[in-house]
Regions:
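Metallo-beta-lactamase
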Residues: 1-99
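Accessory terminal helices/loops
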Residues: 55-60, 68-188
Length: 189
């Protein structure tokens, strides 16, 4: 049951109608991309795995990283919401890729619809739609974002030296950084 990893599995005990979904379901937005680095996680395969779980109509769902759930309708609804969150990220990322947007632009625009974003099973903790969108982009198109300047970018040192010249020297740079910091622009500072 591919999902968080390609070798992921789930365990179904039919006589108890109990399903152990492994790491393919937990009470947080799914880890569709891990910032520590892993091979590409296939969102379509993860969706199919959750669909297989839904098809079984379990009465008990015993995830590895959250409390057990019970009740066929309750479990079906939770699995459906989780599945729909993954599908939404995949489909909207591909749609925006087809419009010519790069990974950073897609990550900025991709927000779950309210009915998905409000689900406690899709709260951002270990993964986010933005990080996941970049994973989908990279999985389908690789690292090139479509901007020719990123094919052979300036070295960081040369870019920094040019930036210092652009703002009028070190003194101006420090003044801009300090003002930004004082205004709450910590990332820019």
């Amino acid at each position: 049951a591919p999902g968080e990893t390609n070798d992921q599995l789930f365990v179904w005990i039919p006589e108890k109608k109990a399903l152990f979904p492994g790491d393919n379901f937990y009470k947080t937005f799914p880890n569709l991309y891990t910032i520590r680095g892993t091979p590409y996680r296939d969102l379509a395969g993860w969706v199919n795995s959750i669909d297989m779980m839904r098809y079984l109509e379990p009465e008990y769902l015993i995830p590895s990283h959250t409390r057990p759930l019970e009740g066929r309708a309750n479990i079906y609804n939770k699995l459906t919401t989780y599945r729909d969150g993954i599908q939404y990220v995949h489909d909207q990322t591909v749609r925006l890729m087809n419009l010519g947007l790069g990974p950073d632009e897609i990550a900025e625009k991709l927000i779950l619809p309210k009915h998905l974003g409000d689900s406690p099973f899709l709260k951002e903790f270990y993964g986010t739609p933005a990080w996941s969108a970049k994973n989908v982009f990279s999985g389908y198109l690789g690292w090139f974002d479509g901007n020719p300047s990123t094919l052979k970018p300036l070295q960081k040192k040369e870019e920094a030296e040019n930036f210092i010249k652009l703002v009028g020297g070190w003194d101006n740079l420090f003044e801009i950084a300090e003002n930004s910091y004082m205004e709450g622009g910590f990332q820019w500072a």
